[in-house]
């Protein structure tokens, strides 16, 4: 990260690069995104082996123990079958992907155990001095750091969930010290460099912990994580130290092997599945293990011995080593099956006995599990998803952990130590490493404990201070065996010493640090709650009170119930205003946590605090406000069924304050919090109509209008422009509008809605399941888990496996217990009937008699009228512009309510500006049942209320036509069509909209992705089942109790029904599973459930994934009933309203249609109808309101398309004449043959514009492009972190599941090894090339000679070190193997999932019952079957093509170069005869009546698309039809944009799942390239990034443009983008030379390039952006001879190259031409520079960087291969002076031609006339021109050109040659080199999404424009001491808005590193520009200091200057002087 500091008053200014958190302002809001991911000591996270390694065997304990396990999930289950394996060193990411599963397990021999135990004791006894010395050193080191820790602890420096790169910056703070330490102290330093990002990602103590870890380097507590070792250590102080003994065993195995490193890197351990014969219920496996009694004996003796020698480090009892269960984070990971082990309950029983044998251990286990309520399923009171929403996470168990060895290795490798040295060194280093760190901690703690219990207060104070130091420097690793249960009571005693504030403060602090360092200790610290609260009730010392708040805040994350029931909520808020801001935040966070699972019985605890919390909403502090909002949202969520409580919570002040909060500009609330607050309002309105009435009276309509459309400018009815909002925000806002209106009735036309809800045979919401924690409290499971358990219970399962939050539990129905499969912890469960399950609490289908909203409509019609007028248009616009099905359905319901309750006059008023009829027509043609039903209902209401108007419109717009079609259709909606219409989209008709809630008190779920308490609404399409696919699928494991059931374990009924629903002939088979049942298409696209308009908030039990066990009959009955209803309703509709229609066609509504048909018939190609028919069409289009339906049904589109494009000999009139006629009629250009003498200029384009708009309307109505989105609301009520959409839940699914593949040698080849490793499990999102790497480094890529041995050469585990190194170090390895599924060759860059999905046999089988749109995760078969992938070597002759098929780059074929043989002839003609090729007319390409080759999709709107394509081409290139026309497009391209297609494209491109699987619909990419004009630039730019590069870049781009996705849980998973970064250091003095070298090395690498400058500490985004800007400047140097233009000397603010000349061309740079006689050496040099430029530009685009090159338009035309159509018009863009001369000379040529064509001229008069043709009074001969290029006398236009004068007779040839040489021939060699360089990075064909004039935006960012204060206020973020109201911020905005172009560039380069902003300006700057206050000592004057910056995060540290003039001066000085240096501030 790069700081540009300028805090020295006058002199040398430096820009700073501070990577410590301390450099950042002391708050946690910076934590979002930061730039630098490294300093010298950082090894990128993805290279961690164990992240990629989740496996079935790990889940059961058959995993070899890995030392450097990161992200390890600790599991306490003993595994007696395990072999030790060598400690894995780090594997590169390429090999994390795949592991085979096969490893035999051997029991340990007892003698070996004893021997190792003795050896361990002996060794540990030998190093006492080392460990003591180290302990002293670390404590001493800690004390000074501790002071810093104390200062910053309450203002969390970093949010715990900061990005990885942020953590890296912090870590890189002190690299130099580390290098100089001894091995021992390197350990301490090394732990500083642990991966704080992974720890923080799920750290239970996020903000505060991160604060400590970032400010306290050595021995940092960055890992509170856990692995298998820590589980034991913190459970029992006397338990052995596993790491040491395991390392010694590893050492004995790997001691001297130099292969250690590679073997560990590239050979993940493999375990073969053992056959097992365990009977059901058996609790023993075949291998002998110590029984429970043996365990007890061992434990007892061990405990005695450790008590005797508590000073010496204990050894480990190998048989008690725990298995690990790791989070998979690579791209492919292997898994093996569960081993037999003990039966689930048997193992648990053994563990329980083992624990009972050791009372202390047992007690601690109980306590620790009580502490970790997150270990239980998600319903826990301490659920982490809720905390996630406000940046608090609670899971201690899922924290990542780097082993120290891994960190040391990372450090030393970064310092240049060869990795292979780690082979022999590894075990010894790690052994030394551990001995020094762990030995002293527990003995030290025991000494301090005695001090705490002493009688002397000074001794106690000293002890508690040292205890603080020990804890603040420690973590679970270093504090193994810390006596928590003894220390906590002692500290509580000290906390009660009221007279001694110091002791109290330190005791409180020690308890806080303890919870940070040992998260599970919070279960013991709970006892201190009453004492903490005492400190808040009577404040004696403010420090103690604030420290108590910090401690309580940490406790509240897991033990909020205990705090609430102790009255803690009120106590925390008692003296709120007296506390510092951080303490206030803590108090409000405690309040929010206490409300998390509050029940109605506990309301009295919070009631008195509500006024204070309500008032707090008006506060300015963002975090305080968000906590308060969270508090109310949780209350409303938990009390949603208690109307009286809701009214007490929602006082008038609350509604007013929240309303104001929503409209504050700039917004205080983040997107997630905004969604939560709006959802809270919806819940209130739907459950308590009186609150809805109150909101309407408070003018909520204006608020909503503002939120959707921005500030109103008075003409809201005329033009509605929606502000950009995420789909989730739109969904919530439309839900709220819907709930503000009364509910629809239940009878009449709406009766069908109730029918849609049926089909739920099994009521899985009928009961609530709860589990009991160790304190005896019952917690409900979240709703979806409760449903899963209930469904299994109902079908009589004995047990099910429930996977939640990354842990697996067995729910045993016989013993009513939940058993954690990893730890064996058993908890009681119970089933309670759900009182809400059968009552209709939603108020949906019955219009409650006392619905206050309906009363209001009657009593206050004016209010109702204004509400409807304000919002109807907005709703309509939301419907039209949204592609996501959920939003559209919700809008439809809201519109229906409005239309139903509005009276006729009002309706007439609000509908007059909207094309309602055409929308209804397109809705009726939809394939989505819900939409069709809604459209019929709407049509019926409108005809009842406004029959006169709509009887005409319904005829004209095609509604009648569609309704008749529905009424007559025999096969109504029977087969699901391929495409989904109108964006109701694939999932539009998905799972039914149940919004049931398990219980009012249900916890906001702890699973980030699963909806817990989704609030009621019409169609809150509850995707919880799909969202929890991971849980459901994990049940398909082989049960441990033997073959009781088949391999899959979903309840049998589900399977049965599933199959019946899919196809009646299918019998029950393992193929079916929940996943299948979750696919709506499997039970009929238009089934009853799929359209369950659970129209009002259906809080009743809905249809869940399990409830689809409804019988086939019910489902098909309902489907048939609804089809019947539609048909019957359509029939009635026609009878009622259109039966009396005159059949003679004389209806006045048909007049326009008849006129249009007549005119269309005259557009006949066989007969010349002149221009009259076009004139008639023009008048119809321009003057009448012809409808899309009429245009469609008149045949006009097809006929006009043929008229404009046909080039048939039989045509009566040629195409060019027809085109000119068309232009004449629609554009007023001259008629054919009547061209004027002067220039043809555009006159009026209104008729053409009207035609384009009509065509676009037609397209919107007809198109049926499917959108694969997953945008169902996934919010957990008000409780949690809101995933943006279901896509992130699906990502989570991919994160937890793998595809099983069998690798097989292809039958065609026998010259490579056969794979014998059995099936492998592969990450679905791994690329095919990952499998290649996996095989190649194991020798499978080596082609054998015939005489070599066959298959038995070497084991699968042998790694070819050279190949592995090659794969590691090079991004561009030659492919050795190719892969097939069946006959299909797989591209290397395709995901394995996509390959299997597209090509596997199973996929073929399943295609008839499922498709991509409806089920993104594929049928269950994909996940349960084994897919065969064949491999064979790449043949030599195929290698070149292989790159194209699937290499990373797939280079496009470049155009033939000018020197190729086929060009030789043309060259000669040009040189000898002066013949140059004619200019290509770009119109020709578009004038075709059929789709071009690259359009493969089918759609009803295809003809309209082709016509629009032709119209756009004519508008853009019309001047090619005329000799002398003005080069300007008729209609701006922006007028062709289709808003509906744009909405679909944007929605599609916001979906993370689609991007990760590369599953972009073909229509989108094809339209993007063939018809880019349909989409705005931003959309195409996103489409480009998604399709042109790897998916990591696409995901990164998505996260950059949609920050709210970052709030979802996808960030910490392995699907988060993992972009490799390569850092290079360059010297500023030789920048260009070194840049060329860097591009040569890394240009084509996939890694992101990061630049650092020599002797500067800055690294990351800022220096890298500056690198591109500076290299761009260097390339413009005049001495390089690259560009044409004038030489200027630029003032260089800094640097040594003063006086350097640069080329400047105001029109834009273009290549300097070469003649035929140019020196080859010079040409080669220039070509090399252009090749480098190509690489630089491509790399900049690829890495999202900007270059600062002002290139001309012709340059970009060359890039897009449009050079053949360059004309004299393009000369104006490179040399206007020459261009003007050429234009005048061309005028002479045109006059000459006219004279020659004049038949009346005689030879003499012609000769005379020609001689009088002059330019500025001079004849052509007098101009003295010769055949050389103007401005370049050395470049001859043809051979001997210097000696050929230009005359009137050869003038035309001369002009053609000048244009051709200047734009083509003279520059072709440079551009060929440029293209070669560019295409070495990625193919140029991907740029087809853009027009030439747009490439400047893509490459260089936004154009310079003035900055206005309003935009700056919206886009910039004041923080850390400043708000938008601060004087300094207002000064700054005023100054920036007055900057000129040069000052803007200076400022931007100073703050961001680049002189230009990205497209979109400040809005697109990522991270946003943040202005923070620069602080000084009280004696210092801010006016004496300069501002400084951190370029990586776009931070401007601005002193609070006394006046605006001083600020302006200081800013400009800093910006000028602070260039080109990155130093520490």
Swiss-Prot record:
Top class in the EC scheme: transferase
Residues recorded as bearing Phosphothreonine in the entry: 1410
Compositional bias ranges of the Polar residues kind: 1-10, 18-27, 78-88, 119-132, 280-290, 326-338, 360-371
Pathway recorded for this protein: Protein modification; protein ubiquitination
Keywords of the record: Acetylation, DNA damage, DNA repair, Nucleus, Phosphoprotein, Transferase, Ubl conjugation pathway
All residue ranges annotated as the HECT domain in the record: 1918-2025
A Pfam family per the record: WWE
SUPFAM superfamilies for the chain: ARM repeat, Hect, E3 ligase catalytic domain, WWE domain
Region spans: K-box: 1529-1603
Highest taxon listed in the record's lineage: Eukaryota
MF annotations from Gene Ontology: ubiquitin protein ligase activity; zinc ion binding
Sites bearing N6-acetyllysine, chain numbering: 181, 1458
Residue numbers bearing the Phosphoserine modification: 12, 77, 85, 100, 310, 312, 975, 1024, 1030, 1049, 1063, 1350, 1355, 1362, 1409, 1460
Biased composition (Basic and acidic residues): 48-70, 346-358, 1050-1059
Biased segments, Basic residues type: 1034-1047
N-acetylserine modified-residue sites: 2
GO cellular component: nuclear speck; nucleoplasm
Catalytic center residues: 1992
Catalytic reactions of this protein: S-ubiquitinyl-[E2 ubiquitin-conjugating enzyme]-L-cysteine + [acceptor protein]-L-lysine = [E2 ubiquitin-conjugating enzyme]-L-cysteine + N(6)-ubiquitinyl-[acceptor protein]-L-lysine
Primary localization: nucleus
Disruption phenotype: Embryonic lethality in the middle stage of development. Embryos exhibit growth arrest, while ES cells are viable. ES cells show decreased proliferation, but maintain both the undifferentiated state and the ability to differentiate.
Biological process annotations from GO: DNA repair; DNA repair-dependent chromatin remodeling; heterochromatin boundary formation; protein polyubiquitination; regulation of embryonic development; ubiquitin-dependent protein catabolic process
Subunit structure: Interacts with MYC; leading to disrupt interaction with isoform p19ARF/ARF of CDKN2A. Interacts with TRADD; leading to disrupt interaction with isoform p19ARF/ARF of CDKN2A. Interacts with SMARCC1; leading to disrupt interaction with SMARCE1.
Chain's role: E3 ubiquitin-protein ligase involved in ubiquitin fusion degradation (UFD) pathway and regulation of DNA repair. Part of the ubiquitin fusion degradation (UFD) pathway, a process that mediates ubiquitination of protein at their N-terminus, regardless of the presence of lysine residues in target proteins.
Family statement: Belongs to the UPL family. K-HECT subfamily.
Name of this chain's protein: E3 ubiquitin-protein ligase TRIP12
Gene: Trip12
């Amino acid at each position: 990260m790069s700081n540009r500091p300028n805090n020295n008053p006058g002199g040398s200014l430096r820009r700073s690069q501070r990577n410590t958190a301390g450099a950042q302002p002391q708050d946690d809001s910076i934590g979002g995104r930061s730039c630098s991911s490294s300093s010298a000591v950082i090894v990128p996270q993805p290279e961690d082996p164990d992240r990629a390694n989740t496996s079935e065997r790990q889940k059961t304990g058959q995993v070899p123990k890995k030392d450097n396990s990161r992200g390890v999930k600790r599991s306490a289950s003993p595994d007696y079958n395990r072999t030790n394996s060598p400690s894995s060193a780090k594997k590169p990411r390429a090999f994390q992907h795949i592991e085979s599963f096969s490893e035999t397990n051997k029991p340990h021999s007892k003698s070996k155990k004893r021997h190792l135990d003795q050896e361990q004791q002996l060794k540990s006894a030998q190093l006492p001095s080392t460990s003591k010395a180290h302990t002293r050193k670390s404590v001493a080191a800690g004390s000074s750091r501790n002071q810093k820790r104390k200062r910053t602890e309450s203002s969390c420096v970093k949010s715990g969930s900061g990005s990885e790169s942020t953590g890296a910056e912090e870590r890189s703070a002190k690299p130099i010290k580390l290098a100089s330490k001894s091995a021992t102290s390197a350990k301490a330093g090394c732990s500083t460099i642990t991966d704080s990002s992974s720890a923080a990602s799920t750290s239970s103590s996020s903000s505060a912990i991160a604060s400590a870890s970032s400010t306290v380097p050595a021995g940092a507590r960055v890992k509170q994580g856990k692995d298998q070792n820590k589980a034991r250590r913190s459970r029992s102080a006397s338990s052995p130290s596993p790491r040491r003994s395991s390392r010694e065993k590893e050492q004995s195995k790997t001691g001297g092997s130099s292969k250690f490193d590679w073997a560990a890197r590239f050979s993940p351990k493999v375990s073969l599945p053992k056959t097992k014969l365990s009977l059901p219920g058996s609790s023993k496996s075949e291998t002998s293990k110590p029984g429970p009694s043996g365990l007890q004996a061992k434990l007892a003796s061990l405990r005695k011995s450790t008590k005797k020698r508590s000073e010496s480090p204990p050894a480990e009892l190998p048989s008690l080593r725990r298995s690990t269960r790791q989070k998979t984070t690579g791209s492919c990971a292997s898994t093996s099956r569960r081993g037999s082990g003990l039966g689930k309950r048997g193992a648990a029983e053994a563990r329980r006995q083992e624990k009972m044998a050791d009372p202390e251990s047992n007690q601690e286990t109980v306590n620790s599990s009580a502490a970790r309520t997150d270990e239980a399923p998600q319903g826990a009171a301490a659920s982490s998803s809720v905390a996630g929403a406000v940046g608090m996470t609670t899971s201690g168990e899922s924290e990542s952990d780097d082993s120290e060895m891994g960190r040391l290795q990372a450090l030393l490798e970064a310092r240049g130590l060869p990795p292979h040295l780690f082979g022999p060194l590894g075990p010894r280093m790690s052994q030394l490493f551990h001995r020094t760190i762990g030995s002293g901690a527990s003995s030290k703690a025991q000494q301090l404990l005695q001090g705490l219990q002493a009688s002397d207060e000074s001794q106690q104070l000293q002890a508690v201070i040292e205890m603080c130091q020990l804890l603040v420097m420690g973590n679970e690793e270093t504090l193994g065996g810390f006596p928590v249960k003894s220390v906590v009571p002692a500290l509580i005693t000290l906390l009660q010493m009221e007279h001694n504030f110091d002791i109290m403060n330190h005791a409180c602090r020690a308890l806080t640090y303890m919870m940070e360092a040992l998260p599970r200790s919070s279960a013991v610290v709970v006892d201190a709650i009453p004492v903490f609260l005492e400190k808040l009730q009577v404040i004696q010392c403010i420090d103690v009170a604030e420290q108590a708040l910090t401690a309580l805040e940490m406790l509240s994350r897991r033990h909020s119930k205990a705090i609430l029931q102790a009255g803690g909520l009120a106590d925390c808020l008692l003296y709120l205003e007296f506390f510092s801001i951080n303490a206030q935040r803590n108090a409000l966070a405690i309040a929010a946590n206490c409300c998390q699972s509050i029940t109605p019985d506990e309301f009295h605890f919070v009631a008195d605090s509500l006024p204070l919390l309500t008032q707090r909403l008006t506060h300015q502090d963002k975090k305080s406000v968000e906590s308060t909002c969270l508090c109310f949202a949780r209350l409303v969520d938990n009390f949603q069924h208690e109307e009286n409580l809701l009214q007490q919570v929602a006082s008038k002040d609350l509604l007013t304050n929240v309303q104001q909060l929503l409209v504050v500009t700039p917004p205080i609330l983040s997107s997630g919090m905004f969604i939560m607050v709006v959802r809270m309002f919806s819940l209130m309105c739907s459950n308590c109509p009186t609150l809805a009435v109150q909101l309407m009276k408070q003018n909520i309509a204006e608020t909503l209008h503002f939120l959707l459309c921005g500030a109103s400018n008075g003409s809201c009815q005329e033009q509605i422009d929606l502000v950009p909002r995420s789909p989730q925000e739109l969904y919530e806002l439309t839900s709220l509008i819907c709930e503000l209106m009364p509910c629809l009735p239940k009878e009449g036309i709406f009766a069908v809605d109730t029918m849609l809800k049926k089909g739920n045979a099994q009521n899985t919401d009928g009961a609530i399941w709860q589990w009991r924690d160790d304190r005896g409290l019952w917690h409900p499971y979240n709703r979806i888990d409760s449903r899963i358990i209930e469904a299994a219970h109902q079908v009589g399962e004995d047990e099910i496996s429930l996977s939640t939050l990354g842990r697996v539990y067995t729910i045993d129905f016989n013993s009513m217990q939940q058993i954690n499969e990893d730890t064996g912890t058993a908890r009681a469960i119970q089933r309670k009937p759900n009182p809400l399950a059968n009552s209709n609490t939603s108020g949906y289908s019955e219009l409650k008699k006392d619905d206050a909203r309906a009363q209001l409509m009657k009593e206050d019609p004016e209010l109702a009228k204004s509400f409807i007028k304000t919002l109807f248009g907005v709703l309509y616009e939301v419907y039209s512009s949204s592609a996501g099905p959920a939003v559209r359905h919700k809008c439809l319901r809201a519109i229906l309510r409005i239309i139903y309750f509005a009276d006729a006059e009002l309706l007439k008023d609000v509908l007059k500006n909207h094309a309602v009829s055409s929308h209804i027509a397109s809705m009726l043609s939809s394939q989505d049942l819900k939409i069709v039903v809604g459209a019929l209902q709407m049509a019926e209401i409108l005809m009842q209320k406004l029959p006169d108007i709509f009887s005409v419109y319904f005829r004209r717009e095609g509604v009648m036509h569609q309704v008749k079609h529905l009424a007559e259709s025999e096969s109504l909606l029977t087969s699901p069509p391929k495409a989904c219409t109108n964006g109701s989209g694939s999932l539009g008709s998905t799972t039914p909209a149940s919004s049931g809630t398990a219980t009012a008190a249900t916890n906001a779920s702890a699973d980030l992705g699963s909806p817990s308490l989704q609030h009621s609404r019409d169609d809150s399409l509850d995707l919880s089942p799909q969202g929890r696919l991971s849980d459901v699928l994990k049940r398909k494991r082989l049960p441990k109790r033997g073959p009781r059931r088949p391999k899959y374990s979903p309840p049998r009924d589900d399977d049965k029904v599933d199959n019946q629903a899919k196809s009646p002939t299918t019998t029950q088979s393992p193929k079916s599973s929940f996943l299948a049942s979750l696919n709506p298409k499997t039970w009929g696209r238009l089934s009853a459930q799929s359209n369950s308009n659970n129209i009002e908030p259906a809080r009743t039990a809905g249809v869940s994934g399990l409830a689809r066990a409804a019988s086939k009959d019910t489902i098909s009955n309902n489907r048939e009933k609804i089809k019947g209803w539609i048909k019957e309703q359509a029939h009635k509709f026609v009878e009622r309203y259109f039966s009396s229609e005159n059949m003679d066609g004389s209806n006045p509504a048909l007049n326009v249609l008849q006129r249009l048909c007549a005119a269309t018939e005259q557009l006949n190609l066989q007969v010349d109808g002149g221009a009259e028919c076009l004139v008639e069409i023009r008048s119809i289009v321009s003057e009448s309101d012809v409808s899309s339906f009429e245009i469609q049904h008149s045949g006009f589109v097809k006929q006009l398309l043929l008229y404009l494009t046909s080039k048939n000999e039989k045509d009566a009139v040629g195409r060019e004449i027809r085109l000119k006629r068309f232009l004449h009629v629609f554009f007023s250009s001259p008629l054919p043959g009547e061209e004027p003498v002067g220039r043809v200029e555009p006159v009026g384009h209104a008729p053409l514009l009207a035609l384009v708009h009509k065509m676009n309307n037609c397209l919107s109505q007809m198109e049926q492009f499917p959108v694969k989105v997953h945008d169902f609301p996934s919010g957990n009520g008000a409780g949690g972190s809101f995933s943006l959409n279901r896509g992130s839940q699906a990502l989570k699914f991919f994160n937890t599941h793998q595809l099983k593949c069998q690798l097989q040698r292809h039958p065609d080849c026998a010259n490579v090894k056969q794979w014998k490793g059995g099936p492998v499990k592969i990450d679905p999102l791994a690329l095919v090339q990952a499998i290649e790497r996996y095989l190649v480094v194991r020798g499978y890529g080596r082609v054998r000679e015939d005489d070599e041995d066959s298959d038995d050469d070497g084991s699968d585990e042998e790694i070819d070190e050279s190949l592995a190194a090659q794969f590691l170090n090079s991004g561009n390895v030659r492919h050795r193997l190719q892969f097939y599924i069946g006959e299909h060759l797989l591209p290397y860059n395709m995901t394995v999932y996509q390959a299997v999905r597209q090509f596997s046999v199973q996929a073929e089988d399943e295609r008839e019952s499922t498709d991509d749109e409806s089920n993104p995760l594929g049928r269950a078969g994909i996940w349960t079957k084994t897919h065969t992938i064949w491999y064979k070597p790449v043949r030599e002759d195929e290698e070149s093509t292989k790159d194209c098929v699937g290499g990373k780059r797939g280079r496009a074929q470049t155009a033939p170069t000018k020197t190729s043989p086929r060009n030789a002839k043309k060259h000669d003609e040009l040189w000898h005869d002066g013949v140059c090729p004619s200019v290509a007319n770009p119109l020709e390409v578009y004038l075709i009546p059929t789709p071009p080759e690259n359009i493969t999709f089918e759609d009803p709107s295809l003809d309209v698309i082709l016509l629009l394509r032709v119209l756009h081409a004519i508008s853009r290139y019309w001047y090619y039809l005329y000799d002398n026309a003005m080069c300007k497009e008729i209609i701006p391209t922006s007028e062709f944009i289709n808003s509906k297609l744009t909405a679909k494209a944007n929605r599609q491109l916001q979906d993370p799942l689609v991007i990760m699987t590369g599953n972009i619909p073909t229509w989108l990419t094809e339209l993007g390239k063939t018809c880019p004009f349909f989409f705005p630039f931003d959309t195409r730019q996103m489409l480009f990034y998604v399709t042109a590069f790897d998916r990591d870049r696409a995901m990164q781009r998505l996260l950059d443009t949609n920050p709210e996705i970052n709030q979802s849980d996808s960030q910490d998973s392995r699907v988060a983008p993992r972009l490799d970064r390569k850092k290079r250091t360059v010297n500023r003095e030789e920048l260009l030379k070194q840049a060329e070298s860097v591009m040569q090395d890394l240009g084509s690498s996939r890694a992101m390039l990061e630049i650092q400058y020599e002797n500067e500490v800055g690294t990351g985004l800022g220096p890298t952006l500056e690198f591109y800007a500076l290299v761009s400047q260097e390339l413009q140097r005049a001495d390089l001879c690259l560009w044409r233009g004038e030489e200027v000397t630029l003032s260089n603010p800094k640097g040594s190259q003063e006086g350097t000349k640069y080329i400047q061309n105001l029109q834009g740079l273009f290549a300097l031409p070469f003649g035929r006689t140019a020196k080859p050496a010079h040409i080669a040099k220039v070509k090399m520079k252009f090749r480098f430029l190509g690489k630089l530009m491509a790399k900049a685009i690829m890495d999202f960087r900007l270059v600062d090159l002002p290139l001309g338009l012709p340059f970009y035309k060359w890039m897009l291969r449009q050079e053949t159509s360059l004309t004299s018009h393009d000369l104006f863009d490179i040399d206007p002076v020459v261009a003007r001369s050429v234009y005048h000379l061309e005028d002479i040529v045109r006059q000459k031609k006219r004279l020659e064509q004049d038949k009346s001229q005689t030879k003499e008069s012609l000769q005379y006339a020609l001689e009088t043709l002059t330019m500025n009074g001079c004849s052509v001969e007098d101009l003295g021109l010769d055949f050389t290029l103007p401005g370049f006398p050395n470049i001859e236009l043809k051979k001997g050109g210097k000696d050929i004068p230009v005359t009137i007779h050869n003038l035309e040839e001369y002009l053609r040659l000048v244009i051709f040489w200047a734009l083509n021939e003279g520059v072709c060699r440079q551009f060929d080199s440029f293209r070669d360089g560019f295409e070495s990075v990625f193919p140029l064909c991907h740029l087809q999404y853009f027009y030439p004039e747009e490439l400047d935006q893509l490459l260089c960012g936004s154009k310079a424009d003035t900055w206005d204060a309003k935009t700056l206020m919206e886009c910039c973020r004041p923080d850390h001491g400043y708000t938008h109201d601060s004087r300094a911020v207002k000064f700054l905005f005023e100054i920036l808005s007055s900057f000129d172009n040069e000052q803007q560039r200076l400022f931007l380069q100073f703050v961001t590193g680049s002189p230009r902003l990205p497209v979109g300006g400040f809005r697109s700057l990522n991270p946003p520009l943040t202005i923070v206050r620069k602080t000084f000592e009280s004696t210092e004057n801010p006016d004496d200091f300069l501002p400084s910056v951190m370029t990586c995060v776009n931070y401007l540290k601005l002193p609070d200057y006394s006046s605006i003039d001083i600020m302006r001066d200081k800013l400009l000085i800093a910006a000028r002087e602070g260039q080109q240096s990155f130093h520490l501030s």
